[in-house]
Amino acid sequence: MGKEIEIKLAAPDAAALEAVGADARVEAVRTGAWQEIRMVTEYLDTPDRAIAARKWTLRRRTENGEAVYTIKTPGDGYARGEWESRKESLHEAVRELVRLGAPGELAELAAGGVSRTCGVEFLRRTAELTLDGTRCA
């Protein structure tokens, strides 16, 4: 199963966020160059919200113009199930997500049709870090 461990932090303003990124302690563990990724995100669900009812999230995100479909499912603590597909069509992506280990029920739900429930556009600034020998992206 795919697994994501995520901890989100908040900064009071852009200047504070820039200061964190430039901090010597961050620079000491940064192993990759800073990158900017333009993202357009749409969340998808069935008309009766069956995906959300299972506490799953089905998302189509465009990252610098490339489509990425993701399904996330509940997990323990900060962890959760997560699978990604870079297929262009929802049908192909769902088939691949299930093949990768996402719940098989997703195919049945998506076959009944899904539509956009909400969305957002943003710019992500990211860099790879190595913490205690573990690569973090």
Language model region names:
Residues M1-A137:
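Phosphate-end processing signature that detects enzymes handling 5′-triphosphorylated RNA
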